[in-house]
């Protein structure tokens, strides 16, 4: 049956709310991952022997070259981190870097051409529909829905300093949801699930996009990361391009790579690229995410040049970078 027939059938059988939740879950679902942890502790009792114990969390793929976002507390002190994709494949993951104060961690697995969770755009509003996808209590790919209850909340989470500017939702959040995406009705990520209020119902908290981007920039800056395009001295992430801007500038692609880190003294720095520039083309080839830029740059040698097209301040610009 054609998709249009299915859509017409859905419109007849489901209300608008149900269709929004279904669409969002189907869109982000392939990029959501299960994270299994192995820890080593001490067995209680007289022998006090080492023992292994596990845990489960969630995360999502934000770059097709295997970069995964989750909570820092999910992977803290883990001896082994195993990631299971929506298609059933499993990989050992390495910790690229973390920002415990804001509960963000960046993982990487040895895979590419992976489905990616798209990032949202525009401010959230109280009352807006949001959907959480994760693995509560190990129940894989569970979908729960609710609304944004409040913005800018402050929470004292165990083992961390006060977390600020959190999104409060009434979406059902349980152990195992941590690190999973909070998405809007279009299936775009607007936050990362981080905490619930113990002994309370309808109180969940998520980390907003601005905090996530700032944490990623700090991870890249510390060199714990290996940012895509390291020959250029940049790190970044896939972001949607504003539709009005695309139309005005006659840009056909929907995504670009937003620069979150410019290495001081590196090629991109010398070319006067800036944080929050959005690269859309390199050497005449489209750039929609870090993996694209990495692939293009790797074909060049030190001393060669790469011409970048990028967006800044609503304008399309070009610059030649010497590697």
Model-found features: residue ranges?
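PDZ/PDZ-like domain micro-motif
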Residues: 178-179, 240-250, 263-281, 296
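Short, structured beta-strand/loop micro-motifs enriched in basic residues and often containing a Trp
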Residues: 111-116, 257-263, 286-290
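Serine-dependent protease modules
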Residues: 2-248, 253-255, 298
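Short clusters of small/polar residues that mark proteolytic maturation junctions
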Residues: 73, 95, 194, 275, ...
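PDZ-domain C-terminal substructure recognizer with occasional recognition of PDZ-binding tails
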Residues: 108, 217-224, 270-274, 280-323
């Amino acid at each position: 049956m054609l998709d249009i027939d299915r859509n017409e059938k859905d419109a007849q059988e489901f209300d608008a709310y149900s269709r929004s939740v279904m669409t969002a879950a189907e869109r982000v679902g392939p990029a959501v991952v299960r994270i299994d942890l192995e820890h080593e502790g001490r067995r209680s009792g007289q022998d006090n022997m080492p023992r292994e114990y596990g845990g489960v969390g969630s995360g999502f793929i934000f770059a097709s070259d295997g970069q995964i976002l989750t909570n820092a507390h999910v992977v803290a002190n883990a001896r082994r981190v195993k990631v299971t994709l929506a298609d059933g494949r499993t990989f050992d993951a390495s910790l690229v870097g973390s920002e415990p104060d804001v509960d963000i961690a960046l993982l990487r697995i040895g895979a590419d051409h992976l489905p990616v969770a798209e990032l949202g755009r525009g401010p959230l509003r109280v009352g807006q529909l949001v959907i959480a996808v994760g693995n509560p209590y190990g129940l894989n790919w569970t979908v729960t829905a609710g609304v944004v209850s409040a913005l800018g909340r402050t929470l004292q989470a165990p083992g961390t300093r006060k977390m600020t500017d959190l999104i409060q939702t009434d979406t059902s959040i349980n152990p195992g949801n941590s690190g999973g995406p909070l998405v809007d009705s279009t299936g775009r990520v607007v936050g990362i699930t981080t905490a619930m209020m113990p002994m309370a119902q309808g109180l969940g908290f998520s980390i907003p996009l601005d905090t996530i981007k700032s944490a990623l920039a700090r991870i890249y800056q510390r060199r714990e990361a290996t940012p895509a395009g390291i020959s250029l001295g940049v790190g970044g992430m896939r972001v949607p391009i504003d539709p009005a801007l695309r139309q005005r500038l006659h840009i056909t692609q929907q995504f670009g790579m937003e620069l979150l880190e410019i290495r001081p003294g590196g090629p991109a720095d010398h070319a006067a690229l800036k944080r929050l520039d959005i690269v859309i083309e390199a050497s005449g080839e489209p750039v929609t995410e870090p993996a694209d830029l990495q692939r293009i740059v790797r074909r060049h040698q030190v001393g060669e040049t790469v011409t970048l097209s990028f967006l800044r301040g609503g304008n399309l610009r070009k610059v030649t970078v010497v590697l």
